[in-house]
């Protein structure tokens, strides 16, 4: 039974990757694997649920990067910004699919059900994540809820006020949604996607610098997206390396941001 469901998910994923969101139907998925539509309906009540579950498969590289980041010692704000950069890097290339997945259902029901359905079939995709990150990926019902986990931890650590955590959660989500919406249907080159990811991160970092508690500043260590050459390799990824640092000398100033190449 489980093997059959995986076939349906993977066939829908292949159609999404090859032909786009509007190309997927129960009939096309059934034709792709040589089964009847009735067989699919035994596992998925409608095409929207199948598309949502299959869309989670596009997050595999993002989850792999999160697995790598979970092994690096970072505070909650550093980790949150790194995760946002990873999510932007992958989702902007499939803006239509991710806009539909994250925001196609305003109450978050589609995303949470898709996450649950996908990881029931592919629990191995979550292997190696730390406990709180595992919970964050598996249990968060919306993008905003995932964001709030780390922002609230930062507030508990005294890096943000509670009000700032709420403000940044809203801002992060609205900005991400706006970027996805703007990118839908646009035919861009790889350099263009890097540029919009860079723009997204610049806007986030500027916003975060205005909300840090006194005594903290943001240091952008390496604002690059690919290490040395243009070949993308998950194990060689070099993206924003953000450090939230204490300001040790002189009066602390909110909104101070430093960047070095």
Kindly label every feature range from the protein language model.
Residues 15, 90, 94, 179:
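Short alpha-helical functional segments enriched in proximate histidine and acidic residues
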Residues 141-161, 165-261:
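C-terminal peripheral helix-coil segments that are non-catalytic and often amphipathic
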């Amino acid at each position: 039974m489980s093997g059959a469901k995986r076939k349906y998910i993977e066939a829908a994923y292949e159609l999404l990757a090859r032909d786009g969101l509007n190309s997927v139907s129960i009939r096309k998925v059934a034709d792709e694997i040589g089964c009847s539509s009735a067989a699919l309906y035994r596992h998925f009540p409608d095409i929207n649920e199948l598309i949502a579950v299959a869309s989670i498969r596009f997050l595999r590289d993002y989850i792999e990067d999160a697995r790598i980041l979970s092994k690096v010692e970072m505070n909650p704000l550093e980790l949150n910004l790194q995760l946002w950069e990873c999510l932007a890097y992958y989702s902007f290339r499939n803006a239509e699919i991710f806009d539909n997945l994250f925001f196609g259902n305003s109450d978050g029901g589609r995303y949470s059900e898709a996450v649950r359905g996908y990881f029931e079939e592919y629990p191995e995709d979550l292997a190696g994540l730390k406990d709180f990150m595992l919970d964050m990926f598996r249990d968060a019902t919306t993008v905003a809820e995932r964001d709030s986990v780390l922002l609230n931890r930062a507030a508990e650590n005294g890096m943000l006020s509670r009000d700032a955590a709420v403000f940044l959660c809203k801002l992060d989500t609205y900005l991400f949604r706006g970027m996805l919406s703007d990118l839908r249907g646009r035919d861009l080159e790889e350099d263009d996607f890097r540029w919009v990811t860079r723009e997204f991160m610049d806007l986030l970092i500027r916003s975060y610098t205005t909300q840090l508690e006194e005594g903290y500043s943001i240091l952008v260590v390496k604002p690059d997206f690919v290490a040395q050459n243009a070949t993308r390799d998950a194990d060689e990824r070099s993206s924003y390396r953000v450090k939230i640092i204490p300001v040790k000398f002189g009066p602390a100033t909110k909104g101070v941001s430093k960047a070095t190449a």
